[in-house]
UniProtKB/Swiss-Prot annotation:
Belongs to the EPSP synthase family. MurA subfamily. It comes from the Bacteria. The gene is murA. It is found in: Cytoplasm. Coiled coil: none annotated. Its EC number is 2.5.1.7. This is UDP-N-acetylglucosamine 1-carboxyvinyltransferase. The active site is at D117 (proton donor).
């Protein structure tokens, strides 16, 4: 049944919130279990819609998947199927991450082109090019990525852009290829590091983890393992930005602040007091936020997933800010909804200029993707009156217990069935 959120603005948020495992990590870890026959256990899984969706994809490939609490127990068969059908894959983008493991383990794959968030073009060109360099034939046929190989052999691979998805798919095929693979301009995101950590626990030989140059020495086989998902830095930062916007005081636990240094620096520039420990941070804002300029970049830059929240923050900041989107070209669709809330914002190509106002005004708004939805809810927290946010299933795909956590922090928010 379709649902909406009703957000009443004006409340100051305060308290403590613990984040779960990272959405951008857990789905790839689940896919990686296909590389090893037997049962792997993944803990600290977030309570989000995409986890059971990925479980369905894996079941369709012959795996047995048990989900209980924050644990996923996945048993990969001795001969996985290699055809990921459209019905399961179409619902979310990360489903394409089964491509690399299937090519690595089965030497063939047929994966329907995925669905997911409407944030711009995200072609699979680099995924295909990397697999071809490993010796696979890889093409788009009838709406599917079709790949096959007699043997995979290590290669020197230069990525045009440090794509997270391409890095991960190439990596998961290369760990069982013959010889040595070097990925130049590899993605350095904490989620990629988390995947490498699990693969090495399974018996892979991956070096240069977290650096732009990754070296993989192929091994004949991998083995099941148990692994704990890292904390979700995007969810954690969302709570930190919510504190800054509402002039609140929120402690966020369960995440490594080292994964968010630039974001926390920007919050400090906006006037927040930021303190950190090894696995937590606290954001306290006592006055109206100051304007800040933000440019999204691959890690360790400012995450593109937090761009909508940055626009929401600057929409009520003192001064004029420029937000530059360097990763996804269509992510500024979110600005149209912010304008409905009274934001003074305009876009020009990859740039958005936002002139901060003392307060936004309530209006009905629609989510186009996970992060845009979270940004709209944050905007509703500082709007005058009741803001109705529609298509909130997007938010449920990436934020566990979103309404409950906000309510515990002092927000006035309600989930309503349409």
């Amino acid at each position: 049944m379709a649902e909406r959120f009703v957000v009443t603005g004006g409340n100051r948020l305060s308290g403590e919130v613990t984040v779960g495992g990272a959405k951008n990590s857990v789905l790839k870890l689940m896919a990686a279990t296909l590389l090893a026959e037997g049962t792997s256990t993944i803990t600290n899984c977030p309570d989000i819609l995409d986890v059971p969706l990925m479980a369905e994809v894996l079941r369709g490939l012959g795996a047995t998947v048990e989900l209980y609490g924050d644990v996923a127990r996945i048993t990969s068969p001795d001969e996985p199927k290699y055809d990921a059908d459209f019905a399961a894959v179409r619902q979310f983008r990360a489903s394409v991450c089964v491509l690399g493991p299937l090519v690595g383990r089965c030497k063939q794959a047929r994966v329907a082109l995925p669905g997911g968030d409407a944030i711009g073009s995200r072609p699979l060109d680099m995924h295909q090019a990397g697999l071809r360099q490993l010796g696979a034939r890889c093409n788009i046929e009838h709406g599917c990525v079709v790949a096959s190989a007699e043997t995979l052999r290590g290669a020197e691979i230069q990525l045009e852009f440090p794509s997270v998805g391409a890095t991960e798919n190439i990596l998961m095929a290369a760990v069982v290829a013959e010889g040595v693979t070097t990925i130049h301009n590899a993605a350095r995101e904490p989620d990629v590091v988390d995947l490498c950590t699990m693969l090495n626990q399974m018996g892979a030989q991956v070096e240069g983890v977290g650096s732009p140059t990754m070296t993989i020495t192929g091994v004949p086989r991998l083995y099941p393992t148990e692994h704990r998902v890292i904390g979700d830095r995007i969810v954690a930062a969302t709570w930190g930005i919510a504190a800054a916007m509402t002039r609140g005081d929120i402690a966020v636990t369960g995440v490594d602040p080292a994964h968010l240094q630039l974001v926390l620096h920007k919050l400090h520039d906006a006037g927040a007091t930021v303190t950190q420990t090894d696995d937590s941070f606290r954001v306290a804002q006592y006055e109206r936020p100051k304007a800040v300029n933000v440019a999204t970049l691959p890690f360790p830059g400012f995450p593109t997933d937090l761009q909508p929240m940055a626009i929401a923050l600057t929409s009520i900041a003192d001064g004029t800010s420029m937000i530059t989107e360097n990763v996804f070209e269509a992510r500024f669709r979110f600005v149209e909804e912010m304008i409905r809330l009274g934001a003074d914002a305009r876009t020009d190509g990859h740039h958005a200029v936002v002139r901060g106002l003392p307060q936004l005004s309530s209006a009905p708004v629609w989510c186009s993707d996970i992060r845009a939805g979270a940004g709209l809810v944050l905007a509703g927290l500082v709007a005058d009156g009741d803001t109705e946010v529609y298509d909130v299933f997007h938010i449920d795909r990436g934020y566990p217990l979103f309404v409950e956590n906000l309510a515990n922090l002092g927000a006035e928010i309600e989930r309503v069935c349409l």
